Design a protein with these regions (language model features):
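Positively charged n-region of N-terminal signal peptides that target proteins for export
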Residues: 1-7
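Bacterial N-terminal signal peptides
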Residues: 7-15
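Sec/Tat signal peptide C-region and signal peptidase I cleavage site
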Residues: 17-21
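Extended amphipathic ligand-handling, pore-lining, and cofactor/metal-binding catalytic surfaces
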Residues: 22-291
């Protein structure tokens, strides 16, 4: 009995150093008392159906990919947060969730936003992070369309997904939101890459940026297009997809004599796009925190 008890105590002593330094999939060894979390940041949506297929889906993929991290979410749109609050649904902002994580004792945080561009929203998120105190390390992942490699991967995924809609006079148009920052040039880059990489019947246009609906109509006319499929170039196929793309844009192109169908699928619904966000989490870089 004494021998068995001695063996048990000996084994426990051997295990103690391992408890002091637990290996984490992103941060490496974590010391006793250190805890790691992943914060997924979304613009948000008031539509339950598309939320389940996009935001909830990518959150689930993150939990599956990083089982040793506590996964939380935050939303950035004040308007959507207010709408949901009236329904009795509470969504917190990045600042609120980060403060809560700090109170709960989390020391290492990685943040991944489901944004497309390196623009105003990413800059706003960095300002929120810069105000945080008490964390030992914070990492921020890149948006979906950060590099040329990212853009090429996305165009290939989309072209493959909609190959059924492409033909000699059949075209696919991916409609993005657009931006008032220099990041809006990314849409023109995507448009160019479709053609450069062998998908000349795939195009990109934007609701509030460039290329515009007017430039799109001129291009389709010059190409003698007959049929067009409109697809949201948006993480969530919400109000813009339903009102602008399937409404105003569809009507405008039909007035040009085109046969138009809409595939209202958000980027967040596509497994390969979800995989790209997961890869950006893995490659997230440390963000300098001031004391």
């Amino acid at each position: 009995m004494k021998k068995a008890l001695f063996s048990l105590i000996f084994c426990m002593l051997l295990a103690m150093p391992a408890a002091r330094a637990r290996e984490n999939s992103l941060f490496g060894p974590l010391q006793r008392g250190e805890r790691a979390a992943l914060l997924m940041v979304h613009f948000g949506t008031s539509h339950d159906d598309t939320r389940e297929r996009t935001i909830d889906a990518v959150n689930a993929r993150a939990r599956e990919a990083f089982p040793d991290l506590e996964v939380r979410e935050a939303w950035t749109s004040p308007t959507i947060i207010r709408i949901l609050k009236k329904r009795g649904i509470v969504r917190q902002t990045p600042d609120e969730v980060l403060q809560q994580l700090r109170k709960e004792g989390y020391t290492h945080i990685v943040i991944q936003a489901t944004l497309l561009l390196e623009g105003a929203e990413t800059e706003s998120l960095r300002h929120v992070v810069a105000r945080q105190k008490g964390f030992k390390e914070v990492r921020i992942g890149k948006p979906l369309l950060y590099s040329v490699k990212d853009c090429r991967q996305v165009t290939e995924i989309l072209a493959t997904r909609h190959v059924d809609a492409v033909g000699r006079r059949n075209h696919v148009v991916f409609v993005g939101h657009g931006s008032y920052t220099p990041a809006t040039a990314t849409y023109s880059q995507l448009d160019h890459l479709f053609t450069a990489d062998g998908h000349p019947n795939c195009h990109v246009a934007t609701i509030e940026g460039y290329p515009t609906l007017l430039t799109l109509k001129e291009r389709l006319k010059s190409l003698k297009a007959r049929r067009v499929r409109l697809v949201p170039l948006l993480f969530v196929a919400g109000d813009h997809a339903r009102n602008d793309i399937a409404g105003e844009w569809k009507e405008a192109l039909e007035k040009e004599g085109l046969q138009v169908d809409c595939r209202l699928e958000g980027l967040g619904e596509i497994p390969e796009i979800q995989d790209l966000y997961i890869s950006h989490i893995r490659s997230a870089e440390p963000w300098h925190l001031t004391d």
